[in-house]
């Protein structure tokens, strides 16, 4: 009688099959985790923008508009109607926020990121009247929503 140690071929095949089944279940669950994190950063940037705009309004009685990119560059920026000044705001990396000045009582903004290819891929927020909402998904003033 020989004293063999080790696994048989059947035992190894069973382990490989079990690992394959676990991978087939786990990979789809975690595949879009990065996109979800980017969408969360877009919503976070919009919340921070609401706070920055309200602080700006407190000082100037006006809102600012413009396009802000996550690389720290403000590509375009517009004064409020009263020309009160410009908003200092930098979104997260690779996020682009376009703020549309409507009037001294409101504005709207949308946020996008090229890393998001699925849906939702755009988030928005508004301040002022509901007609300012960038999309029907944006239902509450000052509360970001994605579509």
Language-model-detected regions and their locations in the chain:
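Periplasmic/extracellular, small/polar-rich flexible segments of pilin-like filament-forming proteins
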Residues: 51-147
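Short, contiguous, well-ordered secondary-structure segments
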Residues: 1-2, 55
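Conserved catalytic core of two-component sensor histidine kinases
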Residues: 16, 43, 50
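N-terminal single-pass transmembrane signal-anchor helix
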Residues: 2-34
